[in-house]
Amino acid sequence: MYKYKKVRRISSNLIEDANRRYIVSLDNHVELMEALAAFCKDLTVYCGQVRGIGAISEATFRMYDPATKQYVDKTFSEQMEITNLTGNVSQKDKLPFLHVHATCSREDYSCVGGHLLSARVNGACELLVDEFGDTFAGREFDEETGLYLYKF
Ligand code: FE
């Protein structure tokens, strides 16, 4: 589903074993969020950040309306470049919980983007995952917003 390599040193200020950085290459045709979740679970990444670029054939974004607390999903089924993917990893129900946003460019160079639900890799997907191994970041349902917010 993916290949990865651990970056040997992030900076001289960080404790190498507690804070880990990985270069991750997702396999072609996998579903991005599923593969990233599998990576985080396999490598026990429960607190971290993710960034990346890649090429995909389909993406589904989710828009949340805070007024109605309803989700509206929209799928774009076309070849696109992930011009930027940014997200974080926390822990919910003892599993890695991903919160990822992405901007994707289309054939005409216009962009679509938002909160990423799923994407199908078609070409390559190259990610950098930073784990903050000694930090706990959970998730808790928040009545006011209707979202699972950070619980520290
Ligand atoms: Fe979001």
Predicted regions and their residues:
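N-terminal intrinsically disordered, cationic/polar leader segments
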Residues: 1-98, 103-152
